[in-house]
């Protein structure tokens, strides 16, 4: 078992109690980030869930040139630092270009490799050299077994603080499904490194030719329960006070007001599954 320790209170591992990587999709404003973080911290502390705040400073892969991308690197780091200073929690954000890695790592406790960029060697090496823990998003077009090649790149570049994340797999055009058997494959080929599940991005669904993703928010609880029943290191989640007004991926976002009952169910599943004795079936 390989664990990744992010703080004295947050250790990410497949056999450890699950860690929540939760926040908002894109950093819309300082006030919204702090409002969301406050609710996440309240609920996770009440339920005893290790917690990392998530927010993107730039959504560089938006489908439309007219879509909101975020506040940018400088302002985004100020917002993430404000969350850290106010609530004392680790933070995670995604990096899209090699030159961004070093300044992001000055603030972020976890740097994220976006799914669409997971095979970009220059970016992998730049993230590895930060010395920070890295969350590797498995591309929608990549089989679970192929994640081994991405892991090998990071290890060769000198960084073994790796977390692997599944965010769904393409099923034909404009649709994603979650392969529940894939989680175990990712654990196996990586030497049992922590594997987490991005439930909200897995709910994306797009109408052909649409400029923005739709989503299946109503099914977020059932998909999260199913994923956590496998036995995972963590859950990756995005919520919003008013998903209809979110500037990115609102149709997949959990309403922030439902965070506590949602996480109570997820934690109950995680606690139950990890109370079982290991069962080896050859």
UniProtKB/Swiss-Prot annotation:
GO cellular component, one term: cytoplasm
Catalysed reactions, semicolon-separated: D-arabinose 5-phosphate + phosphoenolpyruvate + H2O = 3-deoxy-alpha-D-manno-2-octulosonate-8-phosphate + phosphate
Entry keyword Ubl conjugation: no
Enzyme class, UniProt record, top EC level: transferase
GO biological process annotation, one example: keto-3-deoxy-D-manno-octulosonic acid biosynthetic process
KW Repeat (keyword) present: no
Subcellular location: Cytoplasm
E.C. numbers: 2.5.1.55
Disulphide-bridged cysteine pairs: none
InterPro entries: Aldolase_TIM, DAHP1/KDSA, KDO8P_synthase
Annotated metabolic or biological route of this protein: Carbohydrate biosynthesis; 3-deoxy-D-manno-octulosonate biosynthesis; 3-deoxy-D-manno-octulosonate from D-ribulose 5-phosphate: step 2/3; Bacterial outer membrane biogenesis; lipopolysaccharide biosynthesis
Pfam family, one: DAHP_synth_1
SUPFAM superfamilies assigned to the protein according to its UniProt record, in alphabetical order: Aldolase (SSF51569)
Top-level taxon in the UniProt lineage: Bacteria
Keyword entries, A-Z: Cytoplasm, Lipopolysaccharide biosynthesis, Transferase
Family membership noted in the UniProt record: Belongs to the KdsA family.
NCBIfam families: KDO8P_synth, PRK05198.1, PRK12457.1
Protein name: 2-dehydro-3-deoxyphosphooctonate aldolase
């Amino acid at each position: 078992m390989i664990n990744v320790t992010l703080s004295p209170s947050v250790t990410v591992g497949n056999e450890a109690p699950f860690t929540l990587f939760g926040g908002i999709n894109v950093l819309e404003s300082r006030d919204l980030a702090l409002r969301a973080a406050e609710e996440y911290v309240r609920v996770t502390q009440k339920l005893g869930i290790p917690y990392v705040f998530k927010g993107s400073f730039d959504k560089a892969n938006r489908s439309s040139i007219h879509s909101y991308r975020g506040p940018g690197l400088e302002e985004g780091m100020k917002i993430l630092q404000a969350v850290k200073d106010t609530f004392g929690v680790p933070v995670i954000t995604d990096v899209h270009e090699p030159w961004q890695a070093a300044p992001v790592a000055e603030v972020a406790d976890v740097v994220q490799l976006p799914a669409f960029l997971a095979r970009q060697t220059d970016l992998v090496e730049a993230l590895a050299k930060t010395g920070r823990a890295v969350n590797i998003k498995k591309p929608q077009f990549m089989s679970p077994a192929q994640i081994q090649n991405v892991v090998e790149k990071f290890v060769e570049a000198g960084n073994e603080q790796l977390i692997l994340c599944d965010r769904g797999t393409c099923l034909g055009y404009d649709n994603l499904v979650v392969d529940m058997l894939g989680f175990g494959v990712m654990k196996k080929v990586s030497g049992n490194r922590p594997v987490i599940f991005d439930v909200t991005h897995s709910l994306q669904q797009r109408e052909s030719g649409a400029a923005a993703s739709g989503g299946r928010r109503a099914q977020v609880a059932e998909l999260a329960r199913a994923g956590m029943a496998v036995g995972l290191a963590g859950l990756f989640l995005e919520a919003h006070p008013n998903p209809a007004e979110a500037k990115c991926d609102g149709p997949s976002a959990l309403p922030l007001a439902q965070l506590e009952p949602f996480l109570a169910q997820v934690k109950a599943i995680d606690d139950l599954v990890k109370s079982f004795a290991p069962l080896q079936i050859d």
